[in-house]
């Protein structure tokens, strides 16, 4: 559970969302976030190659079932757009208090359990009958995994350095806030997630579970344990995912970001459909964006890389169908100054010189519950003014509280692209104080 809690903290503070990373490539033409995902794979690959070479672990390589992996990956990619996040993202967003993610998580675990050991297991097994027997690229070529791990790590380091150099050359705006409320750089988060993945394998193997990080099977086991009470389902993997929930809750609570947010009926239905699709797709593909995307890819297995390719395709189709960016309102007037805190942005007080907007995030004051009808953030949500509002003196505020990944990132990136040089954008996602230029 300690490894899971650490993962939950890092993912929550780093906003580590594979759905958003893939979506950015297609909608924003941005690969910066995806590099963080490659960093996870690179660190993981080096670490697992080292542990295998030293005889600390003995990975059991999965054989490649093309139809199941391709179809499952595509379904999973579509589903994580509807659910508002990938498997690990849904776990850590649940820890932030997002009720829509709770729905997605529940049906993700139930559908995965049905696919693995329930009434859908026959369907799952049937699609996996076509099995090539192929395992990994290194085994096919008869070479060490180091021949893949080192070049991949070097290429990732080179690309990351290029992005960091570009970022360093741009003017920055800093926020005066305590260290525990500051976000974690995605590249730092990626490196830590990779290290935790390396640590996870020997710890898991010591309990008899010869595997590393994983979300789908542990989620299925957790639901099976809850419904049957059988102790065999309570294992290292189930404690891992519970730890993610605990860690993300602690991180969100300390940073002032935890808040119960309740989606409307339509959004809830989408989250449920997305959760079911995640469980079905991940079970067919043999893993999610963690099991396939972070573990199997680092072993350079056919299953891992083909699954990720079809997950990306599913995200591309889903993003084109359901996601819509919005940004700064062109020609917005600049009124008097003032800064919202997170609490103020929820209750929507009127700023001096700024007209209040109609918000879909409403707070029940007695119970600290927020009703967010745009929880998943799909294009078909009811119309609202999601543009950044002027605060005066070249500052704007964008209210994203109540939206699930990846919608806040879409709005923020679009808004930033429309700012003039020297202007500032404040996101009402966390408790912040007066921003300062640097």
Could you describe each region identified by the protein language model?
Residues 289, 412, 436:
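Ser/Thr-centric signal marking residues that sit
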Residues 1-355, 360-363, 368-372, 376:
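Membrane-interfacial helix-loop segments of redox and metal-homeostasis proteins
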Residues 207, 400, 426:
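Conserved short-loop catalytic and cofactor-binding motifs
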Residues 417-429:
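Short glycine-rich, basic-tinged beta-strand/loop micro-motifs
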Residues 381-420:
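An N-terminal amphipathic alpha-helical segment
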Residues 430-436:
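Residue-level detector of conserved catalytic or cofactor/ligand-binding positions
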């Amino acid at each position: 559970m300690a490894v899971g809690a650490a993962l939950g903290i890092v993912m929550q503070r780093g906003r580590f969302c594979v759905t958003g990373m893939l979506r950015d490539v297609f909608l924003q033409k941005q690969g910066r976030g995806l590099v963080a995902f490659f960093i996870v794979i690179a660190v993981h690959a080096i670490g697992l190659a080292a542990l295998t070479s030293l005889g600390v672990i003995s990975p059991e390589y999965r054989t490649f079932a093309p139809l199941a992996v391709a179809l499952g990956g595509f379904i999973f990619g579509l589903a994580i757009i509807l659910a508002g996040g990938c498997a690990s993202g849904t776990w850590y967003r649940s820890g932030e208090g997002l009720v829509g993610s709770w729905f997605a998580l529940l049906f993700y675990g139930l559908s995965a359990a049905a696919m693995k050991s329930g009434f859908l297991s026959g369907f799952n097994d049937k699609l996996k009958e076509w099995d090539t027997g192929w395992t990994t690229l290194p085994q096919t070529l008869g070479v060490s995994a180091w021949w893949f791990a080192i070049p991949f790590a070097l290429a990732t380091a080179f690309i990351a350095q290029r992005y960091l150099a570009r970022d360093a050359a741009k003017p920055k705006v800093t926020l005066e806030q305590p260290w525990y409320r500051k976000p974690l750089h995605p590249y730092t988060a990626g490196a830590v997630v990779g290290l935790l993945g390396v640590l996870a394998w020997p710890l898991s193997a010591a309990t008899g579970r010869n595997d590393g990080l994983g979300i789908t099977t542990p989620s299925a086991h957790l639901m099976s344990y809850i419904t049957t009470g059988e102790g065999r389902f309570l294992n290292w993997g189930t404690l891992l995912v519970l730890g993610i929930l605990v860690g993300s809750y602690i991180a969100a609570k300390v940073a002032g970001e935890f808040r119960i947010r309740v989606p409307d009926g339509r959004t809830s239905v989408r989250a449920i459909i997305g959760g079911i699709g995640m469980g079905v797709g991940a079970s067919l593909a043999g893993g999610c964006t963690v099991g396939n995307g972070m573990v199997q890819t680092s072993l350079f297995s056919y299953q891992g890389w083909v699954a990720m390719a079809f997950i990306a395709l599913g995200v591309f189709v889903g993003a084109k169908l359901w996601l819509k960016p919005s940004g700064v309102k062109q020609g917005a007037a600049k009124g008097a100054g003032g800064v919202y805190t997170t609490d103020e942005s929820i209750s929507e007080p009127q700023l001096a010189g700024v007209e209040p907007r109609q918000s879909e995030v409403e707070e029940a004051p007695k119970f600290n519950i927020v009703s967010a009808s745009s929880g998943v953030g799909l294009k078909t949500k009811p119309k609202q003014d999601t543009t950044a509002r002027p605060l005066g003196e070249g500052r704007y505020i964008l209210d994203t509280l109540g939206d699930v990944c990846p919608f806040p990132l879409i709005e923020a990136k679009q808004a930033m692209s429309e700012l003039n040089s020297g202007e500032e954008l404040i996101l009402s996602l966390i408790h912040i104080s007066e921003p300062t230029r640097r």
